[in-house]
Design a protein with these regions (language model features):
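Segments of small-molecule ligand-sensing domains
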Residues: 162-174, 183-243
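Periplasmic-binding protein-like
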Residues: 35-40, 88-98, 104, 116-123, ...
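Solvent-exposed loop/turn segments at secondary-structure junctions
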Residues: 1-2, 17-18, 42-46, 70-75, ...
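Extracytoplasmic ligand/sensor domains, especially the bilobed periplasmic-binding protein
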Residues: 1-69, 118-139
Length: 243
């Protein structure tokens, strides 16, 4: 919905496969993880994650040794993990999300994948996924996020309000939805109208400066350009709290 495919009344706020892949793949290769094997969800989203991550692996001097594609909602990743182990890649990139990503990480731990020296790179994951996995299993995972609740005083203040209502810290998606809707509603108020053209004009003219984006801007094609953050899951002994 952006770049050459943009429309006059659409905005793309939080992330896409390009930004998610760039941070994680680039950092992993520069840290020595220069050979990759992908375990990929076999539909458009997974294919795009794999394609974009492969581009950044190779652009930074790395090499993709292979890939295995799995159906949505796969209960058993053993054959795919065995292929990843056999390939001997330094990094196993998980180009999937949600239940598939969680299952793949859990089973990789059971297989001893990381204990044998391979690293896991999650190309889309949320803090709720890490909480579900638990730190003993998730420790060391690399992922790229547009938001983390404990990054600044502003992120902590907003996240505490969220926690008081929902009894859990917000994911990047939840924070980004709030950020985008607030920017829209402020533009409606300033325009004194819900006319799409008038509101979009103000949204694009007004910098995005809130608890999600320190220096965001809605580009002419509707993409909100902002910082992304490379994250690594702490080991249990490093963590000072549940979230």
């Amino acid at each position: 919905i952006t770049n050459e495919a943009f429309g006059p009344y659409t905005v793309h706020w939080a992330y896409d496969t390009y930004s998610l892949s760039k941070g994680t793949a680039t950092a992993a290769v520069k840290a020595g993880g220069d050979t990759w094997f992908f375990i990929t969800a076999d539909y458009a989203f997974g294919h795009d994650l794999e394609k974009d991550a492969s581009h950044f692996v190779e652009a930074n001097g790395g090499k993709v040794l292979g890939r295995a594609r799995h159906p949505l909602n796969t209960p058993d990743f053993s054959s795919f993990l065995l292929q990843a182990q056999t390939a001997g890649a330094k990094v196993v990139g998980l180009a999937n999300a949600g239940a598939d990503m969680i299952t793949a990480v859990k089973q990789s731990s059971e297989f001893g994948l990381t204990k044998s020296g391979q690293k896991l790179a999650v190309l889309l994951g949320y803090i709720s996924d890490v909480e579900s996995l638990g730190l003993p299993v998730a420790k060391g995972l690399l992922l790229t996020e547009p938001f983390y609740w404990d990054r600044t005083p502003e992120t902590r203040a907003w996240s505490q309000r969220f926690f008081e209502k929902f009894k859990r810290m917000p994911t990047a998606a939840q924070a980004s939805v709030y950020s985008s809707m607030t920017h829209y509603l402020k533009a409606v108020k300033q325009a004194g109208s819900t006319d799409s053209a008038a509101v979009m004009k103000i949204m694009k003219e007004t910098p995005v400066k809130d608890f999600v984006a320190d220096n965001g801007v809605v580009r002419e094609d509707g993409r909100m350009v902002h910082d992304m953050y490379l994250c690594q899951v702490k080991a249990p002994e490093e963590s000072k709290g549940k979230w």
